[in-house]
Amino acid sequence: MALQQEIIQALGVKPSIDANAEIRRSIDFLKSYLKTNSFLKTLVLGISGGQDSTLAGKLCQQAISELRQETGDESLQFIAVRLPYGVQADEQDCQDAIAFIHPDRVLTVNIKGSVLASEQALREAGLELSDFVRGNEKARERMKAQYSIAGMTKGVVVGTDHAAEAVTGFFTKYGDGGTDINPLFRLNKRQGKQLLAALGCPEHLYLKAPTADLEDDRPSLPDEAALGVTYENIDDYLEGKTLDDTIARTIEGWYLKTEHKRRPPITVFDDFWKR
C-alpha cells in the first residue's frame, strides 16, 4: 500500500463528507461514551478561540444538553476552560467562541504563574529553557489544569486533535495531545470548517489563520509557516488527491518523524521507529 493511502486509512479521512451527518456522529459518540461510563458527569475542554476548540466545544455542549434532557440528570455539564498565558492576544475571538458555544460553565486558569515557576525551578537546577521548550511547557500546563478540573468534577478531558494535525504531529506530546476522547478525529481542516458553517458559527472564528501561539519569540506564528505546507495542501493529501512531489514528501516526512506522538510509550515489542 502506498504511504498516502496508509495514512488516509490510519486517520479515517473521507474524501468528502455530509457535515450534518458528521455533527450527529460526533455528538452521538460523546453521548454514548458518557452513557456507557455513567459515573462520568462532565466534559472538560480548553477554549482558545480558534477553529478546533470552537468546534469541539460546540459539539460537547450539544451532547451534554441532549443527554441532560434525555436522562433528567442535571449534574451533567460541559465545562469550558479559558487557559491564557498572561493576556491573550486574540481575547475577543475567545469571547466570541464562548458566546457561540454557550457552555454550562466557564472556568479561567491563567497558566503564566505556573509556567514561570516551573521555568525558575529548572533554572535553579542548572537548565535554561529555550523558547521552543517553554512553549511546550505552556501546552502541558494547560492540559494539567484540565485534568485537575476533570478530576474534581468526575469529568473527561476532550481533545481537539483532527487528521490535519495528526498527520503532521502538530501537537505537544502530553500537552494538547494528551486527552481522553477526541470527537474531531477523522476530519481534516476544511471539513472542520464545514461543520462549523453548518452549526452557524461566526466565520471569523474558522477563517482566521490557525496558530498554536506557544513561542514568545515568534508570537502568533501561523501553523502553516511552522509546517512549511498549507492546510489546503494537507487536506488535499488526506483526501487522496495528487500533489507536487515536494509537498507530498514534506507531509510524509512530518508523519514519519512524529509517529511516536500518535502511539503509546514505545516498548520492546514496537518496531515502527526502525523504518
Curated annotation (Swiss-Prot):
Underlying gene: nadE
PANTHER family: NH 3 /GLUTAMINE-DEPENDENT NAD + SYNTHETASE, NH(3)-DEPENDENT NAD(+) SYNTHETASE
EC numbers for this chain: 6.3.1.5
SUPFAM superfamilies the record matches: Adenine nucleotide alpha hydrolases-like (SSF52402)
Pfam families in alphabetical order: NAD_synthase (PF02540)
Protein's name according to its UniProt entry: NH(3)-dependent NAD(+) synthetase
Residues that coordinate or bind ATP: 46-53, 160, 189, 211
Pathway membership: Cofactor biosynthesis; NAD(+) biosynthesis; NAD(+) from deamido-NAD(+) (ammonia route): step 1/1
GO biological process: NAD biosynthetic process
Keywords tagged on the record: ATP-binding, Ligase, Magnesium, Metal-binding, NAD, Nucleotide-binding
Record GO cellular component, one term: cytoplasm
Catalytic activity: deamido-NAD(+) + NH4(+) + ATP = AMP + diphosphate + NAD(+) + H(+)
UniProt enzyme class: ligase
Family: Belongs to the NAD synthetase family.
Annotated positions binding deamido-NAD(+): 140, 173, 180, 260-261
Subunit structure: Homodimer.
Protein species of origin: Enterobacter sp. (strain 638)
Residues holding Mg(2+): 52, 165
Purpose: Catalyzes the ATP-dependent amidation of deamido-NAD to form NAD. Uses ammonia as a nitrogen source.
